[in-house]
Amino acid sequence: MVKRGLALLLVGLLGGCMQATLAPSSNASLTSRDRQLLAHARYAQATIPETYRRHIVDYTRKEQPGTILVDTNSKYLYYVLPGGKAIRYGVTVGEEALAWSGIATVGKTAEWPDWIPTAEIQARLGPYPKRVAGGPDNPLGARALYLYEGNKDTLYRIHGTNQPEYI
């Protein structure tokens, strides 16, 4: 279980606590598997508005470096860095996740995770196979952080997407 002090704090209002964007972060390093899976992804050319791209921003709240905050109203995720900075990412928060708030730890991480749609998701958005293998057609995207309360999986994830146009 990964516990490197990462905590998730869902916050309703973070307005006014962030300064101007300093500069876009450099592109993430892609593994050879990432490059192979993304080579022909239908969303490879999706345009994400500049404001929702990854940026390093000033951060003046009290959370410690390593903390992850999700601002559901502004649709941003902040990864707190040392020195009053944070990496800000544009996000979409699913309807189910809006029902939960609190503090959790990252209990597990996965690259190209499989997705097992719940019965509720099947009824609302399906039909899907019982299991969708990791890859460019999987709604969880390339990475997932599994959120735990104590030793219990909350079933909530911070994950990528195969639909960046909805960010």
Regions found by a protein language model. Give the residues of each.
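Structured catalytic/translocation cores of nucleotide/phosphate-coupled proteins
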Residues: 8, 23-24, 110
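C-terminal/domain-terminus segments
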Residues: 8-10, 162-167
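Bacterial N-terminal signal peptides
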Residues: 5-16
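Bacterial Sec signal peptide processing site at the extreme N-terminus
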Residues: 15-38
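Residue-level recognition of conserved structural "scaffold" positions that shape functional pockets
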Residues: 12, 23-24, 97, 167
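Gly/Pro-biased beta-strand-loop elements
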Residues: 41-164
